[in-house]
Amino acid sequence: MAELSSDFDLAPYIEHSLLDPAATLEQIDQLCQEADRYHFAAVCLFPWVVRQAREWLNGRSPRLCTVIDFPNGASTAASKVYAAQEAVENGAQELNVVVNLGWLRSDRADLVHQELAEIVEATGVPIKAILEATRLNPSELEQLTDLCLDAGVTMLQTSTGWFGGATPALVQQLRQLTRNRVGIHAAGGIRTWDQAAALVEAGAIRLGTSYGPMILQQRLAASTPAPA
């Protein structure tokens, strides 16, 4: 993608996230209001508040996303499937599922595939597989992307943000590995307009960040002429 112009609208790329386990209902309400005000693509919240967020959003444009087994991905497949089904019943429209890296590194990629495929089949909503890509070697990353595609996921998310952030190089690598068959969701450490723009230029179609309003305000401030 060509370099973004200074007036490019990043809002439709942003998944406005609040994944602090101590966040209050008031903070989550504010997050939903901000997502609606700025016309963000989605909000991403913990499962316990999905039902309330559905009521707050009440048919507004931001999609409602939640995480499954965040941030470790180490629960049993059965518990993940149950959590995914419950989240959808409560109103989640997209699910960000942390994959089980332990199975992958134990030469049981088949179980990683089976788990994701079961979640895809059981829910019927877009599934984004969180790869924790910065922890994988090139061979592991290629194997994981292949099985995610075969399992039917809609998008690949670079990481939880707990083990390094997204980079343009990583986004480009994932695009090459997937041959653009699914979207790339960049997440982790995205705090500035320049960072966000570079990731979109690299090919990301979704940006997971809790700094969405600040990112847009930075660009607005930079483009506002100084008083004479």
UniProtKB/Swiss-Prot annotation:
Tell me, what is one Gene Ontology molecular-function annotation carried by this entry?
deoxyribose-phosphate aldolase activity
What EC number(s) does its UniProt record assign?
A: 4.1.2.4
Q: Which GO terms describe its cellular component?
A: cytoplasm
CDD domains documented for this protein: DeoC (cd00959)
Where is this protein found? Cytoplasm
One of this protein's GO BP terms? deoxyribonucleotide catabolic process
Concerning Pfam families, the annotation shows: DeoC (PF01791)
> Any stretches that span the bilayer, and where are they?
none
> Is Cytoplasm among this UniProt entry's keywords?
yes
KW RNA-binding (keyword) present: no
Pathway(s) this gene product operates in, as recorded in its UniProt entry: Carbohydrate degradation; 2-deoxy-D-ribose 1-phosphate degradation; D-glyceraldehyde 3-phosphate and acetaldehyde from 2-deoxy-alpha-D-ribose 1-phosphate: step 2/2
Alphabetically ordered keywords of this record: Cytoplasm, Lyase, Schiff base
- SMART domains listed in its UniProt record: DeoC
Catalytic activity as recorded in UniProt: 2-deoxy-D-ribose 5-phosphate = D-glyceraldehyde 3-phosphate + acetaldehyde
Q: List the disulfide bonds.
A: none
Q: Which Gene3D superfamilies match?
A: Aldolase class I
> Which top EC class applies here?
lyase
The function of this protein is:
Catalyzes a reversible aldol reaction between acetaldehyde and D-glyceraldehyde 3-phosphate to generate 2-deoxy-D-ribose 5-phosphate.
Q: What family does this belong to?
A: Belongs to the DeoC/FbaB aldolase family. DeoC type 1 subfamily.
Give the protein's recorded name.
Deoxyribose-phosphate aldolase
